[in-house]
Amino acid sequence: MNDDKTERPVKTANQRGAARLAAVQALYQMDVGGTGVLEIVAEYEAHRLGQELDGATYLKADAGWFRSIVSGVVRDQTRLDPLIAAALQDDWALSRLDSTVRAILRAGVFEITDRKDVPVAVIVTEYVEIAQAFFDDDEPKLVNAVLDRIAKQVRGETKK
């Protein structure tokens, strides 16, 4: 084990993963706090992405990826929400979902619909892992099922 405190570069994939997590947190904060997109992006870029906050150091994130997800979800929410609602079970309304789950699904669906350069398997896996970071129960399974359904509908493929 190396005790060397030198900073190692963070791989691009990890920076995108960190950006996805930060985007979900920002979308959640916007949903429950009514914060605007410009304000939230500025706050995260100045004080959170790759920064230390309350003794915890945030992983360096791809700021462009973060901005793309947050602004894309806000811009396209009226297109994304019906896709999510249609992929839920008949007795579930999008408004019944936990705010964190809504943020995860919106970000994941945005990437599925708008980031065709990213494989479905990567998108679904990343957002299921984010769900697992917040929930122990059925929520990660729900995220997996909904994103898989939407990927099949939009791209004609599912996570393999």
Swiss-Prot record:
Biological processes, Gene Ontology terms: DNA-templated transcription termination; transcription antitermination
Protein name per UniProt: Transcription antitermination protein NusB
Gene3D superfamilies hit by this protein: NusB-like
Biological classification of the source: Bacteria, Pseudomonadati, Pseudomonadota, Alphaproteobacteria, Hyphomicrobiales
Gene Ontology terms, MF aspect: RNA binding
The keyword RNA-binding belongs to this UniProt entry's keyword annotation: yes
Highest taxon of source: Bacteria
Any one Pfam family match given in the protein's UniProt record, by short name: NusB
Physiological role: Involved in transcription antitermination. Required for transcription of ribosomal RNA (rRNA) genes. Binds specifically to the boxA antiterminator sequence of the ribosomal RNA (rrn) operons.
GO cellular component, one term: cytosol
Family: Belongs to the NusB family.
NCBIfam families xref list: nusB
Key words of the record: RNA-binding, Transcription, Transcription antitermination, Transcription regulation
HAMAP family in the cross-refs: NusB (MF_00073)
